[in-house]
Amino acid sequence: MTSGSPKITNLLTRVKRIIPPLLDTFHKGQAGRVGVFGGCQHYTGAPYYSSMSSMLFGSDQSHIFCEKEAANVIKSYSPDLIVHPFLREKDKAGPEDSVDKCFELIKPMMGRLHAIVIGPGLGRDEWMQEIMAKVIEYARKNDMPMVIDADGLWLIQQRPELVSGYHNVILTPNVIEFKRLCDKLDIKSDGPDACNQLAGKLNLLIIQKGQSDIISDGATAYACSVPGGLKRCGGQGDILTGILATFLAWRHAYLSKEWDTEGNMDAKECLFLAAFGASACTRWCSRLAFKECGRATQSTDLVRHVGKAYNALMEDEIPSVEEKIKD
């Protein structure tokens, strides 16, 4: 943890408060409807990892909005996925297609979602990026929680004003993406206070992924040092986005008081707790998969352990969690 920040187990105790109970009075979708925006001809796995992880962690539904040519491939991964082929790459668009028409297909769905993820498998095609800019603008206007990762961060690097000052978004850069964002804003990326500086300059929350994940809004910073696995396979960041989106959907339910909630945490505190909970559970998921598979670990192995990671850190009693983390 960073100096002066709470113990891991104290934070996890608070994280648990935003998790909705499993009640027979709840209806389908009340425990979270997540939207994942990404998936193109070359990248179909990333949106699957994000969407599937969100459901395996506990959201009721997850929708994938992807490029038309990626849709059937993504659908084939699981019948649990809801796939909308509403995105278009510029060189594959027909004469009837346009950025505005694509967004008009998406817009009616947005009101059904509690949290969205932008970036997994998105690519950098001009149209795909422009459509996402419209999605971000709409989400911000309607105060929707957002997670932005991967090539969604490429868009933010080009147009930081899309999210600057927005209180309901979390950026999740890896080391390369973090450096690009810092370079854009004239911040030394390898400085000891770089995450605080970047978060402060953008005036939003960042999870800087690394040996320990640094979570900062520019004023307060926590370090999540829950031990993870040692295999750095592609796709782990996508799993983080899905778990994080589920936490943000639960945060929405908590703040809406959809059950008799414990305590009276505000939106800002819940945002921090969602970020910390997602980081901790993703890292523990990686640890479980690595323990089983070792050097052969792939992100498909992590997906199989998402539910186990939830049970280990969110369902077990804190003393046993504390012992697990020490092991």
UniProtKB/Swiss-Prot annotation:
Pfam families: Carb_kinase (PF01256). Residues 11-313 form the YjeF C-terminal domain. It catalyses: (6S)-NADHX + ATP = ADP + phosphate + NADH + H(+); (6S)-NADPHX + ATP = ADP + phosphate + NADPH + H(+). The keyword Nucleotide-binding applies. ATP binds at residues 209-213, 228-237. Keywords: ATP-binding, Cytoplasm, Lyase, NAD, NADP, Nucleotide-binding, Phosphoprotein. It is found in: Cytoplasm. The keyword NADP applies. Its EC number is 4.2.1.93. Disulfide bonds: none annotated. GO terms for molecular function: ATP binding; ATP-dependent NAD(P)H-hydrate dehydratase activity. It comes from the Eukaryota. (6S)-NADPHX binds at G121, N174, V175, I176, E177, F178, K179, R180, D238. Its cofactor is Mg(2+). Catalyzes the dehydration of the S-form of NAD(P)HX at the expense of ATP, which is converted to ADP. Together with NAD(P)HX epimerase, which catalyzes the epimerization of the S- and R-forms, the enzyme allows the repair of both epimers of NAD(P)HX, a damaged form of NAD(P)H that is a result of enzymatic or heat-dependent hydration. HAMAP family: NADHX_dehydratase. This is ATP-dependent (S)-NAD(P)H-hydrate dehydratase. It comes from Schizosaccharomyces pombe (strain 972 / ATCC 24843) (Fission yeast). The lineage of its organism: Eukaryota, Fungi, Dikarya, Ascomycota, Taphrinomycotina.
